[in-house]
């Protein structure tokens, strides 16, 4: 019987069960738990390779007569998902993941689950890593250029609010009122990015809130700059319960209308999505972080404080003054800014992520956050925590699968769950929309190799278009065919609430995109979130700002050196 070494097998077909991959220049190692492809029957495309007519490709079945034939197969790829780290072929049809297993020709190959046909295209995944597209639930739609910056970082869904560079958009993730919501839905219709908008959750009666939901808002945002009072929070949640949408909250830093206990009482056990729950981005000073222990709170971080480094505190003051329209010549404004920037709570934030207490990472784009760094900074936290805290339970020095799955969940499945869109996006599984990101391991988390939306390549590393092959320098991220023409109408999604779809908003506005409903939000608890659902008792000392979890002091050292940083951006 023929045999080959692991090294030779990995060079031809990619790694297999038991092999390990280092993720870029981090100290994290992913070990392949299972190989769903069949040894000796691997589907590989190219000259003299397997996927040829009569061999690995079936030559007589049509797409119409065989509903299992995919439009695209990604071969021999390492899937890195909250659900597992494994090797498989991925079949995609009509923009949906239809098969995860072994691809080939059922007439000539045994054990295949994904038939390759005449209508099938091949993307070579050998030696590469595949993740679900990232989801950022904290977007200030200030500049349309954010969309490309997010896309080339691996983000395929952006949820938030705004109207452009207005003062209130620079401060709050809110698209206020039906007219602005409709104009933004029209504006965003042609971009290769899934979109959901948040309306303004600030009213004294239900009607103005309901108007925004009927207009297309998939959530309401409550923000202190508009007045995050207990009454405002309570009313927004009451309306959200009626229409099955999310409420996102940035609480009252100044404690003008009440303290964290007042907000907890106003929430009243109802599910809510808290933004920058550590507090530097805003929220009850100094103890908003305590809400992360509540079973009904879905806590997120924004990326400026992730990970905690020697530069974190210093950069925040100027950033905060700009984002919240504060005046450095006014002592009260400076005091407001100072109250939000606390070394002790920032130092606890990374540890809370590592313990699975903080559940989601997001950007706060151009409003104290960097839209293209959600994924980078998530993995920088994971690396920093491994270096400081050692392996998670069940991991070893050479295998970090539990930590890796916990962290990938923070920007994929968990934000999808929080916004009621996990039935469509957020993970690599059959039946989900094929928003997928392909990575070379040496660039994992920092520079994707290829981004697919709805099964179509929308952006990729590409060399000089006038060259004889695709790879000559300069290799840059460039929009691909899926970003042009009317392709985005099928490869990108606008998420709407049920009531807006029933009211015919897509038809009224002439939207050409795929429309999907958000739902299942109001029954969520923190336990619904994958691998990040811990609910301990969290206490902040009101004088020292020290954070304790079930009585134990929680802190970490600021990082002086990070992976996924300068060496990847020299040119």
Swiss-Prot record:
Post-translational modification: Carboxylation allows a single lysine to coordinate two nickel ions.
EC annotation from Swiss-Prot or TrEMBL: 3.5.1.5
Catalytic activity entry: urea + 2 H2O + H(+) = hydrogencarbonate + 2 NH4(+)
Record-listed N6-carboxylysine modification sites: 221
Signal peptide span: none
Keyword Transmembrane: no
Cofactor dependence: Ni cation
Keywords recorded for this protein, A-Z: Cytoplasm, Hydrolase, Metal-binding, Nickel
UniProt: Ni(2+) 2 binding residues: 221, 250, 276
Subcellular localization, as worded in the UniProt entry: Cytoplasm
Pfam families, sorted: Amidohydro_1 (PF01979), Urease_alpha (PF00449)
Residue span(s) of domain Urease: 133-571
Main location: cytoplasm
Residues reported in the UniProt entry to bind substrate: 223
Family: Belongs to the metallo-dependent hydrolases superfamily. Urease alpha subunit family.
Protein name: Urease subunit alpha
Species this protein is from: Corynebacterium efficiens (strain DSM 44549 / YS-314 / AJ 12310 / JCM 11189 / NBRC 100395)
